[in-house]
Amino acid sequence: MNAERLMQVLLAPVVTEKATFVAEKHQQIAFRVVADATKPEIKAAVELLFKVQVEAVQVLNRKGKVKRFGRFVGRRRNERKAYVSLKEGQEIDFAEVK
């Protein structure tokens, strides 16, 4: 795993009602990640970018919804999310990240 690949693994933090609830209750942070990212890559990327220790990583693949606009049928893209559990005493402050 080279540093260049790790910099491309995380796409964005997920900021939703569910992600905020999980972050507060279980000390987990949700990220959108590239489709071919593995758990070890996600762990290494979070540790490299945010300088924290990761305890565990859970990933899920979400299928894109089929949407209709008038008589045209389209589809939203598929998405892969990662829920990252941090070790005790660790936290990520997105306001401080540059």
Curated annotation (Swiss-Prot):
It comes from the Bacteria. GO terms for molecular function: rRNA binding; structural constituent of ribosome. Part of the 50S ribosomal subunit. Contacts protein L29, and trigger factor when it is bound to the ribosome. One of its GO terms (biological process) is translation. Belongs to the universal ribosomal protein uL23 family. It comes from Bordetella avium (strain 197N). One of its GO terms (cellular component) is ribonucleoprotein complex. NCBIfam families: PRK05738.1-3, PRK05738.2-4. One of the early assembly proteins it binds 23S rRNA. One of the proteins that surrounds the polypeptide exit tunnel on the outside of the ribosome. Forms the main docking site for trigger factor binding to the ribosome. This is Large ribosomal subunit protein uL23. Pfam families: Ribosomal_L23. The lineage of its organism: Bacteria, Pseudomonadati, Pseudomonadota, Betaproteobacteria, Burkholderiales. PANTHER family: 60S RIBOSOMAL PROTEIN L23A (PTHR11620). The gene is rplW. HAMAP family: Ribosomal_uL23_B (MF_01369_B). The keyword Magnesium does not apply. Keywords: Ribonucleoprotein, Ribosomal protein, RNA-binding, rRNA-binding. InterPro entries: Nucleotide-bd_a/b_plait_sf, Ribosomal_uL23-like, Ribosomal_uL23/eL15/eS24_sf.
